[in-house]
Amino acid sequence: MAKVIGIDLGTTNSCLAISENGQTKVIENAEGARTTPSVIAYLDGGEILVGAPAKRQAVTNAKNTIYAAKRLIGHKFEDKEVQRDIESMPFEIIKANNGDAWVKAQGKELSPPQISAEVLRKMKEAAEAYLGEKVTEAVITVPAYFNDSQRQATKDAGRIAGLDVKRIINEPTAAALAFGMDKGDNKDRKVAVYDLGGGTFDISIIEIANLDGDKQFEVLATNGDTFLGGEDFDQRLIDHIIAEFKKEQGIDLKQDVMALQRLKEAAEKAKIELSSGQQTEINLPYITMDATGPKHLAMKITRAKFESLVEDLIARSIEPCRTALKDAGLSTSDIDDVILVGGQSRMPKVQEAVRDFFGKEPRKDVNPDEAVAVGAAIQGEVLSGGRSDVLLLDVTPLSLGIETMGGVMTKLIQKNTTIPTKASQVFSTAEDNQSAVTIHVLQGERERASANKSLGQFNLGDIAPAPRGMPQIEVTFDIDANGILHVSAKDKGTGKAANITIQGSSGLSEEEIERMVKDAEANAEEDKKLTELVASRNQAEALIHSVKKSLADYGDKLDAAEKEKIEAALKEAEEAVKGDDKAAIDAKTEALGAASQKLGEMVYAQAQAEAQAGESEQANASAKKDDDVVDADFEEVKDDKK
């Protein structure tokens, strides 16, 4: 059986692991290190350096040394995040013919998957050297909040590197897998995986359950930010140093590519030192020069100063934690373990923020740099058939439902529901004798149907003639383990059914998902007003329907003036319902109710008369029976007399 390796393709560093016979090992690279810097250098003559060798020569070859390519993967050049990075990157980011963000090095235009493939190729070679055999299959991890194009671009990078990517799995899930399989106990636990890496942030709430010796990893909720990570922390420090140097020397180091590369190295080193010390010194002699001669940079940075520079970045990571917990239906007290993943999670202030939010100390027995690769390797062994004691369950990221009366979306499956899943709900017709219904399938979080993503629609016909609200149409949503959605509708009266199969992930990018959720929050007030308007409209239509029916049955018993008054109120109410003025609809509904009061009294009186007539018949029948009844005495027997 071919070995399936696990690769954590990180923004700053990457890691490789293999799992055999239930034992997982992190494999060292050619330099003997357990992690590899995700840095690629393009030299004159076509030579390519990857990892530490590329990082070492970066200062003298800044324009052709690429780092953090993962931040560009699957992105368009015009994306605001890319535009923000252009200012701070020493290498050139360009717009490709298809609108994607690419990089120019040594005169060549390179795509991010092409650049990332160099790191993957180095991982592949290290695995082959360790195993002594050819490696062609891998599980590669991505941030949980990566969109479809980013995931596809990661798969493309694997293919360019000569790897068949068997599965793309989420980094927090992989870390939970590594943590859960490492625990010898059979305890069920809920874990929060806080993954603050070099370029991305994810939070996942995962339940680890023991099922007869097997372990099930169920993602309850996930959230994140694909442009928040250690690179942003470095940049805050770089910007501070540049501003201070400009104040002192009047020189802007932003214009000097070689100085920027030296600053990046110094900032990264200072950041790491400040995780263990209270102060560090940055010394960069001959950082630049002007007419007066060479300039040297010497600056002390305290931990407190650095923490103040990145305070808002740390705060930005806490809000998704709050959302993920809310989506999972849990409170912080329900979380058994907090796992920190990603190099940036080593920062004491980050750990303090996580501890304060979750109310417990994060675990220290998980290696933040290696856990993700280890989890990927475990999943690789599962896929190769080497082990069957692990089950991963994913979630659907957005709510699913159908359009119902009034143009609102009625949700059948809520976002963050574990898949596979199935849900059914009974609906009815909106008109008398309606012979068909259209089932319009939607995905999103908004109340207004038109504001959500339309996934498709189908018709259910041959509904037996009946008054509105009488037929029972059962709509069933069924999502399989592949995320494919099947929708069916069945008339419970006739047994007639219709269905449609929808590929839930097709045509819906993560940008759309995030936009929908954010739109839902921003437009909560508008949605509330729409819901209230629809409720008023439905109430008005129900009264209109009832009055029309009563008028048809008892109208001839009303005098002409009374009937005319009701018909006028009816017409006004029907006109109001066509508009979007809730107050007008409510007013006309009230007026119709008042105008039709006499008609209502007649309907009530008729119903009462019919009921009394029925009771009278029953009483007569009962009296006839009583003629044959003989009275008898009886004595109640107490328990103690028995």
From Swiss-Prot:
SUPFAM superfamilies membership: Actin-like ATPase domain (SSF53067), Heat shock protein 70kD (HSP70), C-terminal subdomain (SSF100934), Heat shock protein 70kD (HSP70), peptide-binding domain (SSF100920)
Keyword terms: ATP-binding, Chaperone, Nucleotide-binding, Phosphoprotein, Stress response
Function: Acts as a chaperone.
Domain of life: Bacteria
Name of the gene: dnaK
Compositionally biased residues, Low complexity: 608-622
The protein's name: Chaperone protein DnaK
Reported induction: By stress conditions e.g. heat shock.
Lineage, highest ranks first: Bacteria, Pseudomonadati, Pseudomonadota, Betaproteobacteria, Neisseriales
Record bears the keyword Nucleotide-binding: yes
Family: Belongs to the heat shock protein 70 family.
Chain spans, region Disordered: 608-642
Modified residues (Phosphothreonine): 200
GO molecular function terms noted in the UniProt entry: ATP binding; ATP-dependent protein folding chaperone; unfolded protein binding
Keyword Chaperone in annotation: yes
Composition-biased stretches (Acidic residues): 628-642
